[in-house]
Amino acid sequence: MIAIILAGGTGTRLWPYSRNMTPKQFLNLGASQESLFQETSKRLDSLVPPEQIYIVGGDAHEDQLRQQILQIFPDFPIDQLLLEPVGRNTAPAILWSILTIPENNRHDSVVVLASDHSIKNLHSFTHALKLGEKLASSGYIVTFGIKPDRAETGYGYILSLIHI
């Protein structure tokens, strides 16, 4: 499995805590001593080897990305840190990452993760990811989501034909 971590963003929605140079994914907002980006990276530790992780972020945040990923994976291949000169949102970041994957890995399943999610139940996450990988390798497109507790126009909704 290949993992793509989307670590872009300018940090404007969580102002005054986050700023352009310190967006929320680089902040420690939870009980751990790690940033949301580091927590996301760490969730992959037993699932995806560092050489199969790609990180997309803004070139303005190169130092933070490099420092924080090397704290989690000291041998992380820095050439898999993909730096956007200008952010173009989610789809172009995913496409660029996928085009960067070496030819011999292009048949692997790909999981795309936001760097700023807080996931409390690691066991459920790991189970869902392993099951999702199994389904994806059988030709299914898999998406993960949570049941909304209120309407929110800033998010998409999933109409599920199969609930796992």
Spans of features found by a protein language model:
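Conserved donor-nucleotide/metal-binding helix-loop-beta segment in metal-dependent transferases, i.e.
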Residues: 123-148
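Active-site acidic Asp-centered loop
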Residues: 113-115
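Proline/glycine-rich low-complexity loops and linkers
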Residues: 145-159
